């Protein structure tokens, strides 16, 4: 969600 390894 927050573009940290696609979370």
From Swiss-Prot:
Q: What is its main location?
A: secreted
Using the record, list the residue span of the signal peptide; answer none if the entry has no such feature.
none
- Tissue expr: Expressed in the CNS but not in the ring gland, midgut, thoracic perisymapthetic organs (tPSO) or abdominal perisymapthetic organs (aPSO) (at protein level).
Q: What GO biological process term is on the record, naming one?
A: neuropeptide signaling pathway
Q: Which domain of life is it from?
A: Eukaryota
Q: Which residues carry this modification: Phenylalanine amide?
A: 7
> What subcellular compartments does it reside in?
Secreted
Could you list this entry's UniProt keywords, alphabetically sorted: Amidation, Neuropeptide, Secreted
* GO CC terms of this entry: extracellular region
Q: Which family does it belong to?
A: Belongs to the FARP (FMRFamide related peptide) family.
Q: What does this protein do?
A: FMRFamides and FMRFamide-like peptides are neuropeptides.
Any idea what this protein is called?
FMRFamide-like neuropeptide GQDFMRF-amide
């Amino acid at each position: 969600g927050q573009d940290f390894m696609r979370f």
